[in-house]
A protein has these predicted regions:
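A conserved active-site cap/scaffold subdomain adjacent to cofactor or substrate pockets
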Residues: 199, 211-258
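Active/ligand-binding-proximal structured segments within catalytic/core domains
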Residues: 36-52, 76-127, 372-373
Length: 398
């Protein structure tokens, strides 16, 4: 059994501990101590990390009554080592977890929304709510949550028999929990059963910032950050806005309007380009058909190589080649280090584009698929790709 010092004192940064066991596991070494300051991943919170006797410890996990520490090198059984937390990582995790409690309490108190899911990743924290809230309501909850932080209220840990849980006013109660329960309380605020680590005062959280929310099942998923993670995220995004402003020759507050104007201009240019491309293909298609191979029944077979082309343009040219219903055609175009192709057959032909696509895939070292009258695929780029297009035209006829 491992004594979990973090449960009583989340501010403890190191301790002396005895190595009870050490075994190779998961490409490293699984070490069990008689006592630890390292919180193992669980309850939505990330694992602590740090060092054991100077050896890097990257992950801690709960295994029954033991905490297993995964280290880069083995440690001798029976020796005493110093366990030292990566304190910045611990503080980051505590800020997120305590912030989650406070934000969850805010949406519950103000709008009756319940937190039914919590996830903490690296620089990403989410809660799932069982009802939909508006952006204005979430902003109100964010303001309330931050007011709880700035009042610098105590956060305390206590233990209570499960039989006395009903006496507490809690936003959620897990009736399946039995025995002595660990209760985390924010003064005059959230009360919750929790196994995680938390700062001793709300002021240590610093800040809660909601970044986005999306529809999720019958409610919403709220993405937010707290403390240092929130500060660094805000710095990055502020720099993005300033960079956009410099590119647009505008102040930051003018960026949205500038982007809308730029988007309108790009949309207009794309429409003009699309119209010009259609005119070009009206001119190009007859030229390609004039060079097509023709069988005894008058069915034409043509393969076109296009350098400056995208998928939409390729399909547009293909449709113009197939317009008479008596043509089998392929348009092959380069996209970076890949060759892509679309294959089509007119309604009056017997060609199966799935088979033709396989032929093209064989030529270009790739694959594809589709239906009888249309298929598409791709392969690796080679300097001889244009010569292979000529071969493909003959294969289409055969």
């Amino acid at each position: 059994m491992t004594e979990k010092l973090y449960e009583q004192d989340s501010m403890l940064k190191s301790c002396l501990a005895t190595v009870l066991s050490c075994a190779e596991d998961k490409g490293g070494y699984a070490v069990v101590l008689d006592r630890t300051v390292f919180f193992p991943e669980g309850g939505g919170q990330l694992s602590d990390r740090g060092t054991l006797g100077g050896v890097k410890m990257t992950y801690a996990a709960q295994r029954g009554s033991e905490v297993v520490h995964y280290c880069e090198r083995p440690l001798p059984v029976g020796v005493q080592v110093e366990a030292v937390l990566d304190w910045q990582a611990r503080l980051d995790h505590m800020q997120q977890h305590a912030g989650e409690h406070i934000l969850s309490h805010a949406v519950w108190k103000l709008f009756g929304a319940n937190n039914i899911g919590f996830h903490m990743g690296e620089r990403l924290v989410t809660i799932d709510l069982d009802k939909e809230l508006t952006a204005a309501e979430l902003e109100q909850a964010e303001d309330y949550a931050n007011s709880q932080i700035w009042e610098d209220k105590p956060i305390t840990v206590s233990y209570l028999p499960h039989t006395e849980l009903s006496a507490l006013v809690m936003r959620k109660k897990n009736e399946k929990l039995t025995g002595m329960l660990r209760i985390v309380t924010v003064a005059d605020g959230d009360i919750c059963t929790c196994c995680g680590t938390h700062p001793v005062r709300t002021g240590m959280i610093g800040l809660i910032r909601i970044n986005r929310f999306d529809k999720h099942k019958d409610g919403i998923r709220v993405e937010f950050l707290c403390g240092r993670w929130a500060l660094e995220d805000a710095r990055r995004k502020n720099e993005y806005i300033w960079q956009a402003g410099r590119l647009l020759s505008m102040k930051p507050e003018g960026v949205p309007q500038g982007l809308r104007k730029l988007q309108e201009e790009v949309t207009g240019l794309n429409e003009r380009l699309k119209a010009q491309t259609a005119k070009l293909y009206e001119f190009l298609a007859p030229q390609l058909l004039a060079q097509a191979a023709v069988d005894e029944g008058g069915i034409k077979y043509v393969a076109a190589a296009q350098e400056d082309c995208n998928a939409a343009d390729a399909k547009l040219l293909l449709n113009k080649l197939l317009a008479d219903g008596r043509t089998v055609a392929a348009v092959v175009y380069r996209s970076g280090e890949r060759i892509n192709f679309v294959v089509g057959s007119g309604e009056q032909t017997q060609a199966d584009c799935r088979s033709l696509c396989s032929l093209a895939g064989g030529l270009f070292g790739g694959r594809g698929g589709g239906s009888q009258h249309f298929a598409q695929g791709g392969g690796a780029y080679g300097d001889d790709w244009r010569q292979k297009v000529l071969q493909l035209q003959q294969l289409l006829k055969e």
